[in-house]
Amino acid sequence: MSRSALVENVMAMLEDAGFLVSDRCAIRPKSFDIAARRGEDVLLLKILGNIDAFDAQTGGEMRRLGTYLNATPIVIGLRTRDEELKPGVVYFRHGVPVLSPDTAMDLFVEEVPPLIYAAPGGLYVNIDSEILADVREDRDWSLGRLAKELGVSRRTVSKYEDGMDASVEVAAELEDLFDAPLTSPVSVLDGAEEVRDDEPTPDDPDVAPEDEPIVTVFTRIGFEVHPTDRAPFKSVNESDDEHGQVLAGHSAFTETAEKRARIMSSVGEVTRTRSVYVVDELRRESVEGTALIEKEEMENIEDAIDLRDLIMERGEDREEVA
C-alpha cells in the first residue's frame, strides 16, 4: 500500500469513528500529517509505511506540539525494517506511541484499547497490582507459593504487586492460575505515560532570524512563543487569558504560503485555535479561516485585543475558537 493510500485510509477510519479530521499537511517539511478531534480528545498523527523513518527531531516536535495544543501525538504505521507491526500492540518511537492500522481501528472505532506494549526485551502488559494482591490473598497463597507456580523469584512476584509490568507469557499464566482478568489497557490517549520511557521533551528550536520581529510582537503583547521546526506554522503562541492560542506563519505570500495558511485554518478548527499569517505585502485579507496581516501592520499592533480583533475581522469567526 502506498503511503498516500494509507493516509487516506486512516483519515476515512477516523471520520467513521466520529472525529473531525483536518486537511492533510501536503507540504514539506512536516512533523505531522493530520490533526483530529473527537470531543476533548485531540490527536496529531504521523502516518508511515516504515516507522523506522520516524526520526528524533520529528518525535520531539510532535511531543512539543502535543503539549502546546493539548493533543496526543501518535504514529500509525505498517512495519519496521524487520517485521510487520503486530495488532493489539503499542510500540514507541522517540517517546511517541505507535499503532498499526488494525490497532488504531480497535481503539478509535471499536473503542477497545490495546493491552500489550513493546519494550526492550519483548512484549509486556500492565498488571493491575491491587487485583493481583487481592486474588492471591483470597486464595491464601503466599508470595513464595505464587513465585513457585510461576517459576520466578519471590522478589519478582513482590515487584508485580508493587506495579512492575509482566511479560505477555507471565500475564497469561497469572490469569490462568487465578481465572481472573488482571491486565490494564495502555492509555494511548494519555500518551501511554505509564509504560513509555520517560524521555525528556526537547527544548523549543531557535527562532529563525527572519521571524524575530514577529516573535517580538507576540512577546510584547503577552504571548509565550513556541517556535516550530517542521510544522505548517512557524510558532504556537500561548496566552494565559481569554485570547487563547494562535498559530502563526510568516513569509512572502507565495503559492506555498497560501497552502500553509489553508492548512493552518484546518488544523486550527480541529485544535480550537486561531491562525494568522504575516506577509510582506497584503493582497487579500484571509485564506479560509487564517487571517493575513502585513508585516508592518503586525509590528504596530499594541496589545492582544487588537490582534484578536484583527484576526476575527479578517478570518472566519469560528464558534469553536471563541
From Swiss-Prot:
DNA-binding positions: 143-162
One GO MF term: DNA binding
UniProt keyword annotation of Transit peptide present: no
Pfam families named in the record: HTH_3
Domain HTH cro/C1-type: 132-189
Residues spanning the membrane: none
Keyword Transcription regulation found: yes
Keywords on record: DNA-binding, Transcription, Transcription regulation
CDD domains the record matches: HTH_XRE
Protein name: Putative HTH-type transcriptional regulatory protein rrnAC2519
Annotated organism of origin: Haloarcula marismortui (strain ATCC 43049 / DSM 3752 / JCM 8966 / VKM B-1809) (Halobacterium marismortui)
Lineage start: Archaea, Methanobacteriati, Methanobacteriota, Stenosarchaea group, Halobacteria
